[in-house]
Amino acid sequence: FIVSMILLYAASTVYHTFDISEHVNKILRKIDHMMIFILIAGTYTPVCLIVLGNKSGYRMLSLVWGIAIVGIIINALWINCPKWFSSVIYIAMGWVCIMAIRQIVAALTPAAFTWLLAGGIIYTIGGVIYALKLPIFNSKHKNFGSHEIFHLFVMGGSACHFVVMYSLL
């Protein structure tokens, strides 16, 4: 989980910090978007192996990492993949856990489950904001819009899931 979080935030920081050339920026954006798949799968890994820890956990882990690999390939090959399409995949991938919700609820403490659910909801709201480019601000707010709001939700979701992972130690 931590490795996937570091990879995502490192890729995002590099992409959002440096403006080298249009070609390099396009590559960095692709890597940034690919790392979202890695973070989602990285978040699932301890849930599947520690919380579920059975055949359904291994199946879910295989499914999620399979989706991550396919998503990475799609992002690598589809040059102008629409934001809404990527967002739908990210959100759907994030909610695959619904298939084992009873087991997850039974295995986690109520507090850990609440943090897990809160993180998922926060990420989902951020994904919807990103996909729909909401809210639409007037020209007064040129440097703060849906993309920046999305990143605030991503940090909130990451913080919630960090609490869950810490509780599993």
Model-derived segments and their meaning:
Residues 1-169:
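Multi-pass alpha-helical transmembrane bundles in non-GPCR membrane proteins
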